[in-house]
Regions:
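Short glycine-rich, polar/acidic loop-and-turn segments at beta strand-coil junctions
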Residues: 46-49, 80-82
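Alpha-helical cap/lid subdomain in secreted, periplasmic
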Residues: 60-174
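Serine-esterase "nucleophile elbow" of acetyl-processing enzymes
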Residues: 1-47, 62-74, 90-102, 168
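Structural motif
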Residues: 51-59
Length: 174
């Protein structure tokens, strides 16, 4: 059977999800080996340096949406690149939170207007988009950063991980 007859698991996210030629190893590529290729086709569309915002604004989500079909899955993990200034030489940060807040900017990178959303709002766009195609969205909280306090790894359970959990719950995603 062709891969089109099988369900497809699309993985979207940043460098923590995708291996790079620079020696970085994300969890998405090794995950592929855990699935039976006779039953499901896995496509890792994650790319280093991307945030939930830039995955959308660069057209990467549209490229996934163009191929989604009923029975597919979208596994998403963002957050590592969603912090920082909204309008710098990368224009990749999202607004903090999970609410409906927006901020209109003229991007320094190209002078174009953009309405920046909250982190949770971008995730909800991915979730509702996947569901509109009959696919199952799966939200994964970001892997912990290499930040230690008192001998323990720091958690983002009051920021991006929390907002991911809230967005998934709001839209009944896994």
């Amino acid at each position: 059977a062709s891969c089109l007859a099988k369900p497809v698991l699309y993985i979207i996210g940043d460098s923590t999800v995708r291996n790079s030629t620079a020696g970085q190893t994300g969890w998405g590529d090794p995950l592929v080996a855990r699935f039976d290729p006779a039953k499901i086709h896995v496509i890792n569309r994650a790319i280093g340096g991307r945030s939930s915002r830039t995955f959308l604004t660069e057209g990467r989500w549209d490229a996934v949406m163009a191929h989604l079909k009923p029975g597919d899955f979208v596994l998403m993990q963002f957050g590592h690149n969603d912090g920082g200034p909204l309008n710098d030489d990368r224009c990749r940060a999202s607004l903090r939170g999970n609410g409906p807040e927006t901020e209109d900017i003229l991007r320094k990178t190209d002078g174009k207007p953009e309405t920046v959303l909250t982190f949770g709002a971008y995730l909800r766009k991915f979730i509702t988009g996947a569901k509109s195609k009959g696919a199952t969205p799966i939200v994964v909280s970001l892997i912990p950063r290499n930040i230690w306090k008192d001998g323990k790894i720091g958690r983002s359970d009051q920021s991006h991980a929390l907002w991911a959990k809230q967005a998934a719950a709001q839209e009944q995603a896994l």
